[in-house]
Amino acid sequence: MSGFDRRSFLKASMVTAAATALAACASSERATGTTPKAAGKSVMGLVVPKMDEVRVGLIGVGERGIGFVHHFSRIEGARITAICDTDTLVLARAEKAINEYGRDKPAYFSKGDHAYRDLLNRDDVDIVVIATPWAWHHPMAKEAMLAGKHAFVEVPMAGTIEELWDLVDTAELTQRNCMMMENVCYGRDELMVLNMVRQGLFGELLHGEAAYIHELRWQMKEIDRKTGSWRTAYHAKYNGNLYPTHGLGPVAQYMNINRGDRLDYLTSVSSPSLGRAAYAKREFPADHQRNQLKYIGGDMNTSLIKTVKGRSIMVQHDTTTPRPYSRHNLIQGTNGVFGGFPNRIALENGGSGSYHEWDENMDSWYAKYDHPLWTRMGKEAEENGGHGGMDFLMCWRMIYCLRNGEALDQDVYDGAAWSAVFPLSVASVGDRGNSKDFPDFTRGVWQTAKPLGIVG
């Protein structure tokens, strides 16, 4: 048996064994509130052998994914070895960028929806970065892990509770990382607030507020290509919080969710759905496809989450109404509060004035509480860009952890819990706002897991 045939045989054997084990995790249990039996051991705090060089495979290099081409081309110890996209135009753009950086030529794949499997079969890929339309996140991440790769997937991690359980089970069975790349957790402000929380500045935490408020009606004009070509349809199919993780991720880290506390249940309501139909009527001909859709997703969705420890979190979603951008980023404790957009702080003890008034001068707070990671890498992150540097810093940190044998900052349990707001909110809205339980994706490990530390 040749070396190539032997590798193919061993890989196929692993996939078959894994599929058999995963099938034993009853899908009916995954789809309900019942915690399925584990197919492997926990990956909480998973540390994998150090990699001298991290060989990166990229699936999807369009509107979002092209940024990863630039970031990984600039990070020491990372090398892009394979790129897949069904759109030859964006693939050519990625190839041009690689050439301009003077990096080694990666393999390129573009023939058909499943061309990514050719990338997964390569032996020169250690991690797979997935930046595709949402519906592909779950199958691609699962197949990547079954192929022996570590999966890094854009938000949300998956769209149903069953799919989220499937990724948890696959990660545990294969002992591979499956990180949902929540970039906002690497923003300067979010890192600073995490540092403040860990130093006890706000006292005992009580309540958080998170959001994705971002007017995106203009994406409806993207018909055949780009994000709006597939994302618009979600507003005609679901009524709930379609995109919860940008605001929720940082707040969950402040509260040590999955590491001392856990999301317990949520209740969700939506406003009327008016804005997208009105926009379509104004911007498109009467017989245009955008005017043939019935938009059911409320313009504003508000979900309230209760944690096992009794804390509350409000999560909002609005990509339709005309208003300024906001993620809220509010955290309230017994000693005071921080709120974002704009940044402001009020403390009973330790503040510069009365807690009855906001302190909006952040300079002194940055000077004292900037996260060590931002102090170390912030200048380079800002120079390399990506939402103010958070994208570059996230990619840098991923590579750093893999090269130095450290656990990642986000794991499959975080991605599952944060992404679960989407299907649970849809279920709650459809049930007159009645509460829906979060699965315990950690299977109890949250009770003993160590909080996310302050690393530099």
Curated annotation (Swiss-Prot):
Domain of life: Bacteria
Cofactor: NAD(+)
Residues spanning the membrane: none
Residues engaged in binding NAD(+): 63-64, 85, 134-137, 154-155, 183, 243
The keyword NAD appears for this protein: yes
Keywords in alphabetical order: Glycosidase, Hydrolase, NAD, Signal
GO molecular function: hydrolase activity, acting on glycosyl bonds; nucleotide binding
Protein residues bound to substrate: 212, 231, 243-246, 325
Family from the record: Belongs to the Gfo/Idh/MocA family. Glycosyl hydrolase 109 subfamily.
Identification of the protein by name: Glycosyl hydrolase family 109 protein 2
